[in-house]
Amino acid sequence: MNCLNEINSEGFVVIEDVFSGEEIKKIILEIEKITSSEVENSTFRKSEDLFAIRQFHKEVPESLKFIFNSNLLKIIKSIKGEGSFITKSIYFDKPEKSNWFVSYHQDLTISVNKKIESENFKNWTVKQNQYSVQPPVSILDSAFTVRIHLDKTTKENGALKVLNGTHKNGVIRVENIDSKNEVETICEVGEGGV
C-alpha cells in the first residue's frame, strides 16, 4: 500500500476500510470503558457540542492494540518508513446536531513532556497539563496526521475540508489563506477509513 505519491502531490489521502467493523467496535468499547465513569479528568472536555479526549493514547492505552492493526502499520511504513511515533493524539466526538465548525488551519504544534527552551521551538502552550510547542519547519515537514473514522463522515456531519497542495507552501498565516483560489476537497470517509 503506497499512498506517498498522492500525499506528496495533494497533501492528503483518503483510505477506506483500514479497520474492520469489529475493530471499530473494540476501539469504541475501550473509549466507553474510560468515559463511562463520572470522574473528572483534566484531559477530557465535555459540552453539548463536543466531547474530546486529549492525550488519547495515554488516557485510553488499551485501544492502541486495535488502532495499530496491520493495515495502519503498513500505511505508516509506506509514508515514513520505520521509527514513527505519536506526538499528539486527540479523540473528538461531535454530536450529530451540533453546529461545530473548524476553519482552515495547519496543525503546527506537537506535544512534549516538558518545556525546554530551544532555538526555533516557539509558541509554547499548556493544555490539560500537556505542553505543546511549534517546532522548526523541518520537524513539521516530517510529521503527518492520521484521522481515524469511527463512523461515516460526510459533508453534512463534519468531514474534514482540505486545500489541495497547500502543504507545499510552508507555514501559512490564517489571514493569508486564499481559499477562493485553491482547490478544496471534502474528505468524506466511511467507518473504518483514515
What function would you assign to each model-found segment?
Residues N2-E10, F19-E191:
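Non-heme Fe(II) oxygenase catalytic core, chiefly the N-lobe of the double-stranded beta-helix
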